Amino acid sequence: MSDTEKPIKSEEPVDEGVDRVDEEENVEEPAEDVGEAAEEASEAPEEAPAEAATTTEAAPADDDEDDSDLSDLDEDEIKNAAIEDDDDDYNKLSAHRRKVQSSGKKTLKKRATKDSRAADDDEDEIDHSHIDLDPSMARRREIEARIDAAMKPASQRRKKLGEDDIEMMQDERISNLREKMRNAAIADAESNREGQPATHKLQLLPEVKDVLQKHHLADSILDNNLLEAVRIWLEPLPDASLPSYSIQEELFDALVRLPIKSIHLRESGLGKVVTFYRKSKQPQLRIKRIADKLVADWTRPIMGRSDNYREKVVSTRSFDPSTQEIALAVAAKRAQTLKDGTLAEKQAERRRRAHIPSAQPANYRVAPKSEIIPQNRGGSTNDMTFKRLKGKLGVTKTGKKKSGVSIEGRGLNG
């Protein structure tokens, strides 16, 4: 070794002795305070490397003495004591503890309902009206808000209409239509008096047709007395002319479909107008037939008659030859008067008798009474003819049997 290293060896033992004394004092302290010993043991490795760099090379022989001094300390006691202290400190903490409920039941978080979510969405919306914006920006936001509102699906909060609300809407619609029909009829009457064309009812006819064709509005039509407006439309105009044929056709077809009763006829006065169309010569033949059918249907329950044709009672009259003889005598007397009359009377009678024939609906109300008495004849001859015809039909159905030999040779022995 060199001379420079010798003084270093002579000086280091003094430091080792001091360090050894310090370590012995530190070893005796864990009995009093184990926590401080554990902290010093953890901090020792950080300070040791600087000292170890000088002591490990200079005094390798002193390691045995250090181990002998440290062997007096029980390492198990230090570990157990440190663990117990750590458990005590850990138990004092409250953050890691789980709260135990007194009821012992798990409480589930309720799901937010649609209404609550919608309310939260409404609250989250910010009102930007108080913010000062440029006119162009404000207009743009307003347009975007309108587009969003239009693109939104149908509101789920919309209240469903009940039956009462629907009936009220239907009654209101029928009442408004009745007033329109009445005003149109008054306007047409005034136009007719002034010599102008009456077109107000024709303009309103499509709307009236649309309402009268709906079956679910039948009760509302009858309850709100729409038949009164129908009567006003069917009445003749001030110049005694009937309304347009299209109006007559649509209204009479609607009257056939409606379940009209006597109370409705009494309130509206419709029966008088229909009877007028039935008896008048102005309406078309189809309208007269519909009017005749309506009168028959309306008077049947009043007269107590059934609508079943099997139960219908037809009035009959028997033929009396004496009345026929009287009618022939009256006709002969009239012919004699024509011969004895003047020329003017003869011409007048001829003009009245000769005319162009016109088709008229024949409505027979009295049926002739049958006086035929059925007679039972002997059935022997009828039975014989029936058997004879039956035998002939059987022969024609079976037909004649084919003759000759088949290809296979059948019928050779026959």
Swiss-Prot record:
GO CC annotations on file: nucleus
Compositionally biased residues, Basic and acidic residues: 1-20, 127-138
Ranges annotated as biased composition (Basic residues): 94-112
Keywords: Nucleus, Transcription, Transcription regulation
InterPro entries associated with the record: RNAPII_TF_IWS1 (IPR051037), TFIIS/LEDGF_dom_sf (IPR035441), TFIIS_N (IPR017923)
GO biological process: poly(A)+ mRNA export from nucleus
Family matches, as Pfam families: Med26
Region of interest called Disordered, as start-end residue ranges on this chain: 1-138, 395-414
Disulfide links within the chain: none
UniProt domain TFIIS N-terminal: residue ranges: 228-305
Comp. bias intervals (Acidic residues): 21-49, 60-89
Chain intervals with Low complexity compositional bias: 50-59
Subcellular location: Nucleus
Gene3D superfamilies: Conserved domain common to transcription factors TFIIS, elongin A, CRSP70
Family listed: Belongs to the IWS1 family.
Function: Transcription factor involved in RNA polymerase II transcription regulation. May function in both SPT15/TBP post-recruitment and recruitment steps of transcription.
Protein's recorded name: Transcription factor IWS1
Gene name tied to this protein: IWS1
